[in-house]
Amino acid sequence: MEERLSTTSSYPSHPGRSVEEDHNTLLASSSISSIIRGTRGHLNNFIESVGNWLVPSSSGRDDDAVSLDSCQSVYSPVRHHINSGTGGGILMEPSSIHVPENYYSVTIGEAQMVVLKRYQNLRLIGSGAQGIVCSAFDTVRNEQVAIKKLSRPFQNVTHAKRAYRELKLMSLVNHKNIIGILNCFTPQKKLDEFNDLYIVMELMDANLCQVIQMDLDHERLSYLLYQMLCGIRHLHSAGIIHRDLKPSNIVVRSDCTLKILDFGLARTAIEAFMMTPYVVTRYYRAPEVILGMGYKENVDVWSIGCIFGELIRGRVLFPGGDHIDQWTRIIEQLGTPDRSFLERLQPTVRNYVENRPRYQATPFEVLFSDNMFPMTADSSRLTGAQARDLLSRMLVIDPERRISVDDALRHPYVNVWFDEIEVYAPPPLPYDHNMDVEQNVDSWREHIFRELTDYARTHDIYS
């Protein structure tokens, strides 16, 4: 557990991570050449060859597809041989369902996809309980894309509401550090037949589950963190809290561009104080969420701090075995909070916390010792001490004392990248908060179908 994991090991730092939690992995099969920041001249010696930096080795065979049910499968691939009778890793066969004009049907593994004809050469790159993700070539845009099919989106109210949120929020946001929607469609033309939802997105090269296994220099660590903060600030500017930040929901390209995805659990700041604590994958769950205090925007700052620390350590910071153990893991390292924090807890929760063993905080110089950081190049303006200082401000149990996104962006460890166009990008279009009232599955189905119909009317989804 204490060692930095190799790319051939399993992922013991993520026990119990569910299939549903990690179905969004987007992993392209193409090779990676280099990580290039672009035209900024803030740092010297940043552009270098990193051909083997980002993507694990692959046989590259078209008839092999990796099942990405969890982060573990990235490092210990389970290969599923897919019938390649037609080439390209897919099996085309007559469909038992009606296939409308401009669509075609393909079977990928055990899943049937009915997609627009503009998307060719589908390959399975991710699968999970809530859906599958395929890469495809968009013959209209002349580029590779990712197509996500949501499995059983109307199985229950929770799935339906999450599907609506994901589709709606993706269509509203417009920021370089948030995954963009390129198209969305359903092959069903009538509401009473509507069951399948497809979302077309940008295809990325890896997620942070893989990047965590790499040895990163300060420039890459800093730039990845800067982009996470920019993307989250964009959501917060519209009053949207992501709530489910984790390495598998953050993806990167070979040029080091980072994007945040999966908005199925996103909530408005207004709602936050009425929300259940069971949001966010456990390891990245903020103390105020664990203790049922309600939360505000900087709940996402805690999650980003956990991810940042994981990038440095190479393993999960607080790998709790259950809800209670998660709190214990946090205070074992950061110490039991003071009385001003405890007084804000509900009486029953406060009584429980006060009766737990008390812990003294371990200094951040010990939690993140110098040998965990890359050596600082003579030409670099970034240091391990700066990174450690920022972590100490993000991983604060009391949310009232935790650093804000805006202040984190001004911190010396990330402000070398500061660009007002990126940081202060126009906020997303407003989200209709009235949609968050309780509704049944049929109502959510109708709302999603209307969204798809409106999208098709205002966009040329075919060509």
Curated annotation (Swiss-Prot):
Modified positions (Phosphotyrosine) in chain numbering: 278
Active-site residues per Swiss-Prot or TrEMBL entry: 244 (proton acceptor)
Molecular function GO labels: ATP binding; JUN kinase activity; metal ion binding; protein kinase activity; protein serine kinase activity; RNA polymerase II-specific DNA-binding transcription factor binding
Residue span of motif TXY: 276-278
Domain Protein kinase positions: 119-412
Matches recorded under Gene3D superfamilies: Phosphorylase Kinase, domain 1 (3.30.200.20), Transferase(Phosphotransferase) domain 1 (1.10.510.10)
Origin: domain of life: Eukaryota
Effect of inactivating the gene: RNAi-mediated knockdown prevents Mn(2+)-induced dopaminergic CEP neuron degeneration. RNAi-mediated knockdown targeted to neurons results in increased total time in sleep bouts.
Processing and modification events after translation: Dually phosphorylated on Thr-276 and Tyr-278, which activates the enzyme.
Predominant subcellular localization, coarse grouping: cytoplasm
Known cofactor(s): Mg(2+)
Pfam families: Pkinase (PF00069)
Ways its activity is controlled: Activated by threonine and tyrosine phosphorylation by either of the dual specificity kinases, jkk-1 and mek-1.
SS bond list: none
PROSITE patterns reported in the protein's UniProt record: MAPK, PROTEIN_KINASE_DOM, PROTEIN_KINASE_ST
Gene Ontology cellular component annotations, sorted alphabetically: axon; cytoplasm; neuronal cell body; nucleus; perikaryon
GO biological process, one term: hyperosmotic response
Enzyme class: transferase
Homology family: Belongs to the protein kinase superfamily. CMGC Ser/Thr protein kinase family. MAP kinase subfamily.
Function (record text): Serine/threonine-protein kinase which responds to activation by environmental stress by phosphorylating a number of transcription factors such as daf-16, and thus regulates transcriptional activity. By phosphorylating daf-16, plays a role in daf-16 nuclear translocation in intestinal cells in response to environmental stresses such as heat and oxidative stresses. Downstream of jkk-1, may coordinate locomotion via type-D GABAergic motoneurons and regulates synaptic vesicle transport in conjunction with unc-16.
Record-linked PANTHER family: MITOGEN-ACTIVATED PROTEIN KINASE
Name of the protein: Stress-activated protein kinase jnk-1
Native source organism of the sequence: Caenorhabditis elegans
